[in-house]
C-alpha cells in the first residue's frame, strides 16, 4: 500500500499542474468570451471539488483493494472458499457504494442548497473537474502499468533473475502499476461517468422541457431512480451474500 500511496501523491501533483492549465482555459472562455463575471470563480471552485471527488474515490478504491487482495490471498492459503469469495465482494461493494453515495450527495447539495443561478456554473465546473481527474488517473495509470511491466522485464533479463523475484524492484512497481490500472482508473472513471451522465440529464431536462413544473418532476424522478438503484444494488448484494454463505459457508 505504501508504494500505491507514493504513486497517488505523485499523481496529485501532476493533477494540480494540469488543472492550472485547464483553469486558464476556463477563465479565457467563460470570463473573456462568455462574460460570466464572478461565476467563473464558482466554476473554478467546483472543478476542484469534482477533481477532488475523482481523486478521493480512487484513493479509497486502491486502499481497499490492496488490503482486500492481501486478505484474499491469505484466505486462499487457509483453504477457505467462502472467505476468498466474500472478501473481494465486500471490498468491491464498499467501493461502489462510496462512489455512488459521494456523487449523489454532491449533486443533491448543488441542486437543493445552492441558489438556482449558481447551480449551472457549479455543475459545469463539477463536470469539468471530475472528467479531468478521471481521464488523468485512467490514462496515467495505464501508462504507468506498461512502463513498470517493461522495466521489470528488462531487469529480469539483465540480471538473470526469475519473473517475480523480490530482489527486482520493478516487480513491486509492476504490482503498483496493476493496482493503478485496475483500481485507480476504474474507480475514478466510475465516479466521472456517473456524475457526467447526471449533469447531461439535468441539462437535457432544463433545455428540452419548457414547463417548470414538468422540469421539477423530471429532476426529482432522475434522483429518485438513482437512489432506488443504489438501494436495489445493496439489497441484491445482501441476497447474493446470503445464498453464497448458505451454500459455501461451511465448506
Predicted regions located by residue number:
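Hydrophobic, small-residue-rich transmembrane alpha-helices and their short perimembrane loops
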Residues: 1-251
